[in-house]
């Protein structure tokens, strides 16, 4: 019976149903996520989940309003509704813990923020890991709160209440609770330093340096709104500390105009002041008490002052004495009325009075105007008078200073001339001094003329100096010989005359001033002002000329010098309108002055357009232009002065005016002294004004001081770092800098999205990897994205452009060209930093390596524990055996103990051997000890029932020996295991760090095409198919070439087999893909030689394959990234990608960086996890030969581009199925079908059972074996054959683990580039992919994709099984092992480490390298050096002609028509010493003008002479050979090359003589490129070694910055030479079947149009047989850019090897080779020099000796076994200057300054002048006198 249910009502329907709508939106767990964007406006962040890579990001339009909120310690609204809380800084990349409000995934909230362990450790304040919580001594450290802000300033509060708060510039406030005796906080001396604070350091000891080095500007303001009575609070208390340290405390009232203040300044001044103005140092009624910078105490009240000095009390600048007479003062002031009035911001003091002069009444009217706001300190009448008096003291000081400068200059010149030589650098210093003298000379002459001082002697000394110096400075590039004594004397005479002139001027001036003050009142108002300006102008001119002389001495303007010059120009611009106004007031013509100003403006303004670049400038013109301006200004102001003085002329006065220098006091007051002389008496009305302006009171500094300040400013500029240019949001196009619009793309140009910027902030944009011309366009926009301004800059190579954002700028956009090959970085700051992608372009994705680390660490710990246990066991066993054998008897019961012990030994023995083999430790001694013990115990244990007699000591020693050897073995294993574990941990850290940079997920394995064909991941199996085509690898791309030109072909990533592909997307590792999502395929595609190709993506919809295609790519498109997409439906069961020819014209296409991803937006290419695991498994590959394109550097470049994802732009995106939709049933090509049947590529079968009916070549991976065993079917007779390790390397993802042994063993030998950590996984090709640091300890908290579980299991199994099977023996290294003598040699052979090539960088020129292809033994063989040693009786019948176009570097010898029967030219001396039996070959180019001559005739002869200076004619020779030609049988009107080989019969001297016997006035013959070489084979012409410096050389050496950046500094270069070669023979220490050698080098090829047969690189010869060639062998293939590394590993069969650097057909190329490393072992090691070699640009030390070179003079000193000599270049030739020859020192020239002594005589130099005669010569005297 059915159970009855209770009654159901309509209202209850559905109550049992659970609502699942949007259940997928719910998340009930906490997640770890990474911040990918900070939304500062709302204090929220956007996140990327670390586990499933899900992004939590709201719409951009919301500006982060609904993104994840950040936690606060407190926050809310206060009682009146105002918000309060806190905002903490957070950075992109920070790891946070995330929860979800109401479990809604759209409402994330950040619960907490976590730093990685590295950062946390650095911030830790303690060095101990834990402690007793009750330990009072550590309470301060344990309970410390420490906050370090991004500005690197901090706030630290320790557990005892001590607190330190720091600010910029290392300023800080410290509160210390320790007892004073124990506290480091003190103001003693300079007080506690920032570095003395314990809190100022990271945990690792590095100092925490604030980001800003400048001291802070501090202001404390104390004020209120209302006081206690409810009235407005008017007090204003300010405490201000300026960045320069000036301290000021002020009190004011907001409704009153007064201020009281206390101030201390950095120069030691202190003052307490009350004034009637709120302005700093303002007011008229002033009371002040202070200490000035000289330490004098002063008191001031109004116009009265007192000053306490060392010698007494002063008032108004005068010393109080007991008998001071003030009557004169009263008399002068008697009758004087004073009127003070204030008008329009200035104070006028008008004094009217009368005085009696010479019995006549003289009226006096004086007006002093002080401009308000310009001069803050008031100057009284007395002060002005005192200043005028003191100006004479200042002038005396100035003269004293001039004397000191002269003394310094004389010392510098004495140092320069001490060796009677002036080098170029010394000439520059001399030029600076001479420029100063030239600039000051007219100024001093003018002053002398003004003051009527005789300047004849000064002029004479100047002229003498000019006459002496000018010829010396005519040639600034070479070293000149000078008479040092004359040079010193001439300069000294000038300086002495100058000081004498200045003293005369000073005396005349002082006398004139004193007289003038007695006879006259004040100078004319405007005349005085104009004269002040004129004097100031002169000083400014002198100072400016000196400054400009310093700046422009080298004809360059650096940025710092531009800032100095700009400062000078700004002063001129400011003074210009004032000067014009003065002139216009008196109607003075300003045309000349204006013209000079405009000329200066026109010259200097362009120099200031780019203040950050060094500019080339005409130094003389710069100096002249400034000098002209100042001269015209002085002339103008003097003219104004003259006009103003006409007022005095009206009274019949003849006034002469005398000017002084304007001096500057410590108070920065500029003074003027004048002399006014009244010529005639009479009633006079004089009027004078002294106007003191702040602009004219400015402290002057020297050029060096200015430069130092500017340099400091540059060093403190803001640095950027974060790239703001986001690649993934860029679009194709080109910005318009005039209106901010985006136009059509040009030359792969792109435009950034709107970049948020700060106003008035420096930014810098930099291009990286740019070749040729490019441009950077930057436009600025306001908050509404309305265009503000823009700028475009063009340049070549890598370059930068600096900006300051406009005041209202909120956004910027940046545009540039060649985005397919060039990177850009746009960052805040003023200095460019290394390129890095933006954070938006780098999304972290981590792969767990923890299991691997644990396994290796466990093995290391186990090995260490085994060693410890073995030691203890051995001690116990030895003690037991000692007890048993002490009576030399072994009873049956003792034998049982011995047997038990022996069984334990037999059990452990194979285990220990296995461990030793696994870790590559020699077990020979251990095995010997074991066998000895075995042999010893066998007879003893044969009978266990009787007592045996034994020798106790032998028994003990045999056991002891075994245990000792076991302990030694296990200790070695422990050491090696620990080393491997440490390296593995280091490796894991590196890989984990690098994996942070990987973005989304790529479902294509081996997708980069780096010598592995791309495969789609289906059931963890890779598939690819090829139809009618073949593949090869070119760079990082797969090149697919069709078998027939009329048949389309393709490359398929995946399989079209529906049985395999139709299992659903889960088989593609796409478990999370849902219906309605998009699959996006993208790849880089390039078409070669015509036709078009495209990318297609196909989905298996039921039983049909349905596809969508990208836009076809043509040859003209170059390398493009294309995209094709398919939408997932409910029928989708499979997917594949195809790169296919789009028509029948395609011969070849290339592709790379294939990517299949989920989503509708294509993202930058990234490696799949399979690629990364492949990198891990195969990081060190035993590669025998690297071809030209397989090199590390190019791998680095391409990998970097892959990670950035911006190498190519996306084109032809098919955003829906309708684009190029082709719905059809898939039909396999015949070759596809055949390939699946016969087991060609693509036929890999993974199964635990063998396939039935296998075809030949089929690969079966036996899954029943652990590890999996791959096998190939050979035939029915042979059956299945296991693959070799080399073949297994191509197995997808390395399931068998066979090359793991190679990985670990070779890792110890691996030496990669300096920028790569030398670890187990230190492959350059792998580690360069990644940039940022990961935190391996966080992996405990992370999970991987569920669909990676199977890979993880395989990986763990691989590690476990692989390590157990490792055979380390062939890879023993010498890193951490205690080697025995018999195994040490083999270890060194494997590890290598010694470069067997000498002079492998070229620092020693071409030493140790033999010649070039068939060394040319004939100097000047194509007359590029002129005739040189060529000559003879008929030399007048020859001339040298310029090169022709076919050989543009080879000159031509031409004969001149004459009736002479024989014309020939040879060398004297004859160039080549030859010996009997030697064979030589002569070759040369020859042509002639048309000639009717039908007989053979000689065109060149070779003769052998008995002596090198024998006359060249035939009758004087020993033997000779002639090269014959006949114009009737051979066309000789075109260039032809002739050769002749001959053998020397008699030893002698060989010469080559071009010859003609044609008697004609018109006929001419021509020769070029003569060559004589050893042997019977004529080779390509090359110049003789002596010709290299003049012809460009066949192979020369070069030192460039690029080579220095590689760590080499020097290299060999062949520049545009048809053929060149250098060889070096290397004798190998030994050879063997298993002994390998490695060769590596770096090469850079620069060429625009290589010829077809161009080749270059290095060849390896064994004996005379060429065995290997490494480099560029096919110029039709792309030639890599920049320096590329090439590697070769080979097994030689001969100990005699030869390394040859070669270039063939290189007339259009420049080739540089450097860093050649030839070492023992199969790992190409990092470059190092040959043993005992030391090379740099100045010193070389090798087996030849020591050479020290002077690069300025091209001279050098050599110390070798043969000589100790010095060489120098004399007249273009290197000559020996001195040498030690036995007991004799030979010198070319000798200079002695005082005497020469050779016992018993001394020779003294005499240069004596007496009253009657002058003695010059040598004096020979006894040496003892």
Swiss-Prot record:
Keywords: Coiled coil, Virion
Coiled-coil segments on the chain, per record: 393-466, 681-701, 843-891, 975-998
Cellular component annotations (GO), alphabetically ordered: virus tail, fiber
Domain of life: Viruses
Record's keyword annotation contains Coiled coil: yes
Gene3D superfamilies: Galactose-binding domain-like
Keyword Coiled coil set for record: yes
Localisation: Virion
Function: Structural protein, a component of a tail fiber.
Stated name of the protein: Tail fiber protein
């Amino acid at each position: 019976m059915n159970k009855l249910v209770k009654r159901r009502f309509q209202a209850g329907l559905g109550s049992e149903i659970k609502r699942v709508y949007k259940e997928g939106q719910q998340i009930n767990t906490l997640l770890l996520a990474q911040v990918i964007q900070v939304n500062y406006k709302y204090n929220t962040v956007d996140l990327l989940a670390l586990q499933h890579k899900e992004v939590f990001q709201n719409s951009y339009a919301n500006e982060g309003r609904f993104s994840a909120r950040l936690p606060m310690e407190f926050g809310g609204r206060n009682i009146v509704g105002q918000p309060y809380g806190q905002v903490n800084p957070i950075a992109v990349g920070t790891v946070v813990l995330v929860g979800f409000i109401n479990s809604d995934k759209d409402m994330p909230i950040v619960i907490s923020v976590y730093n990685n362990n590295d950062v946390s450790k650095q911030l830790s304040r303690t060095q101990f890991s834990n402690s007793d919580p009750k330990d009072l001594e550590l309470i301060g450290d344990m309970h410390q709160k420490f906050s370090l802000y991004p500005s690197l300033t901090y706030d630290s509060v320790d557990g005892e209440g001590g607190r330190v708060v720091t600010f910029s510039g290392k300023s800080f406030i410290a509160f210390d609770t320790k007892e004073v005796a124990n506290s480091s906080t003190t103001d003693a001396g300079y007080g506690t330093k920032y570095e003395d604070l314990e809190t100022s350091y990271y945990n690792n000891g590095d100092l925490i340096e604030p980001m800003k080095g400048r001291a802070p500007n501090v202001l404390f303001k104390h004020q209120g709104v209302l006081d206690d009575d409810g009235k407005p609070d008017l007090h204003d208390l300010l405490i201000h500390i300026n960045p320069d340290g000036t301290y000021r405390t002020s009190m004011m009232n907001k409704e009153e105009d007064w201020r009281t203040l206390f101030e201390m300044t950095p120069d030691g001044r202190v003052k307490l002041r009350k004034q009637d103005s709120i302005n700093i140092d303002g007011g008229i009624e002033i009371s002040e008490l202070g200490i000035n910078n000289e330490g004098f105490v002063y008191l001031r009240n109004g116009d009265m002052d007192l000053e306490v000095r060392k010698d007494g009390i002063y008032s108004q600048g005068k010393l109080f004495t007991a008998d001071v007479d003030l009557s004169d003062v009263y008399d002068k002031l008697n009758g004087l009325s004073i009127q003070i009035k204030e008008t329009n911001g200035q104070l006028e003091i008008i004094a009217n009075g009368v005085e009696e002069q010479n019995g006549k009444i003289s009226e006096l009217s004086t007006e002093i105007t002080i401009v308000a706001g310009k001069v803050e300190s008031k100057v009284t009448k007395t002060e002005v008078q005192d200043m005028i008096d003191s100006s004479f003291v200042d002038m005396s000081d100035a003269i004293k200073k001039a004397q000191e400068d002269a003394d310094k200059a004389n010392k510098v010149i004495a140092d320069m001339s001490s060796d009677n030589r002036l080098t170029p650098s010394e000439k520059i210093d001399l030029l600076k001094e001479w420029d100063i003298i030239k600039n000051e000379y007219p100024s001093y002459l003018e002053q002398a003329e003004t003051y009527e001082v005789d300047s004849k002697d000064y002029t004479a000394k100047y002229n003498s100096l000019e006459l002496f110096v000018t010829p010396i400075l005519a040639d600034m590039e070479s070293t000149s010989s000078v008479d040092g004594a004359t040079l010193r004397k001439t300069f000294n005479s000038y300086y002495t005359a100058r000081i004498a002139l200045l003293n005369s001027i000073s005396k005349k001036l002082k006398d004139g001033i004193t007289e003038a003050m007695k006879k006259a009142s004040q100078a004319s108002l405007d005349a005085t002002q104009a004269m002040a300006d004129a004097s100031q102008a002169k000083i400014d001119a002198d100072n400016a000329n000196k400054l400009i002389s310093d700046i422009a001495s080298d004809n360059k303007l650096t940025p710092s010098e531009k800032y100095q010059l700009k400062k000078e120009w700004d002063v001129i611009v400011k003074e210009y309108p004032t000067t014009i106004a003065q002139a216009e007031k008196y109607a003075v013509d300003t045309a000349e002055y204006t013209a000079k100003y405009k000329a200066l403006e026109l010259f200097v303004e362009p120099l200031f357009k780019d203040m950050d670049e060094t500019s080339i400038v005409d130094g003389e013109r710069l100096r002249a232009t400034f000098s002209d301006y100042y001269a015209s200004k002085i002339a103008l102001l003097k003219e104004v002065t003259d006009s103003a003085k006409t007022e005095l002329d009206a009274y019949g006065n003849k006034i002469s005016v005398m000017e002084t220098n304007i001096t500057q006091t410590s108070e920065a007051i500029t003074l003027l002294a004048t002399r006014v002389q009244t010529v005639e008496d009479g009633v006079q009305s004089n009027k004078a004004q002294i106007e003191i302006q702040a602009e004219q009171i400015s402290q002057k500094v020297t050029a060096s001081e200015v430069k130092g300040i500017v340099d400091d400013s540059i060093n403190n500029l803001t640095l950027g770092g974060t790239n703001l240019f986001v690649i993934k949001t860029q679009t194709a196009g080109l910005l318009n800098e005039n209106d901010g619009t985006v136009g059509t793309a040009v030359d792969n140009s792109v435009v950034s999205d709107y970049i948020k910027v700060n106003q008035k902030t420096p930014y810098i944009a930099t291009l990286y990897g740019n070749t040729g011309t490019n441009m950077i366009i930057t436009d600025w926009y306001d908050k509404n994205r309305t265009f503000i301004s823009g700028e475009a800059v063009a340049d070549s190579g890598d370059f930068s452009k600096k900006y300051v954002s406009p005041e209202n700028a909120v956004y910027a956009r940046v545009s540039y060209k060649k985005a397919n090959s060039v990177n850009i970085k746009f960052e805040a700051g003023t200095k460019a930093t290394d390129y890095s992608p933006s954070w938006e372009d780098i999304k972290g994705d981590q792969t767990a390596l923890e299991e691997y680390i644990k396994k290796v660490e466990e093995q290391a710990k186990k090995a260490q524990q085994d060693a410890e246990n073995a030691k203890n066991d051995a001690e116990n066993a030895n003690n037991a055996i000692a007890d048993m054998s002490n009576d030399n008897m072994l009873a049956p019961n003792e034998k049982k103990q011995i047997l038990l012990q022996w069984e334990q030994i037999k059990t452990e023995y194979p285990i220990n051997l296995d461990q030793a083999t696994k870790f590559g430790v020699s077990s020979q001694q251990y095995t010997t000890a074991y066998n000895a013990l075995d042999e010893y115990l066998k007879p003893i244990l044969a009978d266990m029932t009787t007592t045996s007699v034994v020798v106790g000591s032998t028994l003990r020693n045999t056991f002891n020996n075994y245990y000792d050897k076991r302990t030694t073995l296990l200790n070695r294993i422990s050491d090696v295991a620990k080393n491997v574990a440490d390296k593995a941990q280091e490796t894991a850290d590196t890989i984990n760090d690098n994996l942070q940079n990987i973005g989304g997920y790529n479902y294509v394995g081996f997708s980069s095409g780096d010598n592995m064909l791309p495969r789609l991941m289906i059931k963890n199996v890779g598939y690819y198919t090829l139809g009618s085509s073949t593949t090869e690898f070119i760079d990082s791309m797969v090149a697919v070439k069709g078998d027939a030109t009329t048949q389309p072909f393709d490359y398929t990533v995946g399989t079209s087999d529906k049985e395999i592909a139709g299992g659903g997307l889960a088989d593609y590792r796409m478990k999370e893909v849902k219906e309605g999502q998009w699959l996006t395929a993208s790849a880089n595609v390039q078409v070669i030689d015509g036709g078009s190709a495209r990318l297609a993506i196909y989905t298996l919809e039921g039983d049909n394959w349905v596809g969508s295609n990208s836009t076809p790519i043509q040859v003209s498109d170059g390398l493009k990234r294309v995209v094709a997409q398919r939408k997932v439906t409910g029928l989708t069961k499979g997917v594949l990608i195809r790169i296919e020819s789009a028509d029948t014209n395609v011969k070849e296409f290339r592709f790379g960086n294939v990517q299949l991803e989920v989503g509708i937006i294509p993202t930058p290419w990234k490696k799949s996890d399979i690629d990364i695991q492949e990198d891990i498994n195969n990081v060190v590959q035993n590669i025998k030969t690297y071809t030209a394109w397989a090199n590390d550097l190019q791998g680095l470049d391409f990998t970097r581009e892959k990670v950035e994802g911006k190498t190519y732009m996306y084109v032809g995106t098919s955003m829906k199925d309708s684009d190029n939709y082709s719905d059809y049933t898939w039909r396999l090509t015949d070759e596809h079908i055949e390939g699946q049947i016969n087991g060609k590529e693509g036929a890999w079968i993974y199964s635990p059972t063998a396939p039935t009916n296998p075809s030949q070549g089929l690969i079966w991976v036996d899954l029943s074996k652990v590890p999996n065993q791959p096998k190939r079917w050979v035939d029915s007779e042979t059956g299945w054959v296991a693959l070799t390790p080399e073949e297994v390397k191509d197995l997808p993802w390395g399931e068998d683990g066979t090359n793991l042994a190679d990985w670990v063993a070779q890792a110890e030998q691996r030496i990669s580039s300096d920028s790569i950590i030398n670890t187990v996984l230190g492959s350059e090709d792998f580690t360069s992919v990644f940039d940022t640091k990961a935190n391996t300890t966080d992996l405990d908290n992370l999970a991987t994709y569920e669909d990676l579980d199977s890979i993880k299991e395989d990986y763990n199994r691989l590690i476990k099984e692989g390590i157990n099977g490792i055979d380390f023996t062939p890879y023993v290294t010498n890193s951490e092992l205690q080697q025995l003598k018999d195994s040490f040699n083999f270890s060194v052979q494997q590890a290598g480490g010694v470069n067997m090539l000498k002079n492998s960088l070229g620092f020693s020129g071409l030493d140790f390298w033999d010649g070039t292809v068939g060394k040319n033994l004939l100097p000047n063989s194509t007359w590029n050096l002129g005739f040189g040693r060529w000559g003879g009786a008929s030399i007048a019948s020859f001339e040298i002609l310029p090169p022709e176009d076919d050989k543009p570097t080879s000159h031509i010898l031409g004969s001149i028509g004459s009736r002479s029967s024989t014309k020939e030219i040879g060398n004297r001396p004859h160039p080549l010493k030859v010996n009997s039996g030697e064979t030589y070959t002569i070759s040369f180019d020859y042509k002639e003008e048309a000639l009717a001559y039908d007989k053979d005739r000689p065109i060149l002869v070779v003769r052998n002479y008995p002596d090198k200076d024998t006359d060249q004619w035939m009758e004087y020779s020993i033997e000779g050979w002639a090269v014959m030609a006949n114009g009737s049988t051979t066309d000789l009107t075109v260039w032809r090359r002739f050769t002749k080989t001959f053998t020397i019969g008699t030893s002698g001297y060989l010469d080559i003589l071009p010859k003609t016997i044609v008697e004609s006035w018109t006929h001419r013959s021509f020769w070029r490129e003569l060559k004589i070489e050893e042997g019977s084979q004529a080779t390509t012409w090359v110049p003789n070694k002596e010709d290299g410096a003049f012809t460009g050389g066949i192979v020369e050496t070069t030192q460039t910055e690029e080579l220095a950046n590689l760590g080499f500094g020097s290299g060999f270069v062949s520049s545009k030479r048809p053929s060149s070669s250098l060889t070096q023979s290397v004798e190998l220490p030994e050879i063997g079947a298993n002994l390998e050698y490695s060769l590596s080098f770096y090469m850079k090829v620069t060429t625009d149009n290589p010829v077809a047969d161009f080749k270059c690189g290095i060849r390896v010869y064994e004996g005379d047989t060429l065995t290997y060639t490494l480099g560029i062998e096919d110029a039709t293939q792309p030639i890599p850019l920049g320096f590329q590394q090439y590697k070769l590993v080979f097994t030689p069969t001969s100990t005699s090897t030869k390394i040859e650097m070669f270039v063939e057909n290189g007339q259009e190329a420049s080739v540089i080779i450097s860093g050649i490393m030839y070492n023992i072992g199969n790992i190409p090691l990092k470059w190092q020099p040959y043993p005992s070699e030391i090379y740099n640009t100045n010193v070389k030390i090798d087996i030849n000796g020591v050479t020290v070179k002077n690069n300025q003079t091209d001279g050098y000193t050599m110390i070798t076994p043969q000589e100790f000599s010095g060489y120098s270049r004399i007249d273009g030739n290197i000559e020996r200057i001195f040498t030690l020859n036995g007991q004799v020192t030979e010198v070319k020239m000798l200079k002695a300054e005082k005497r020469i002594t050779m016992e018993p005589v001394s020779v003294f130099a005499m240069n004596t002048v007496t009253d009657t005669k002058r003695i010059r010569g040598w004096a020979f005297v006894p040496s003892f006198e």
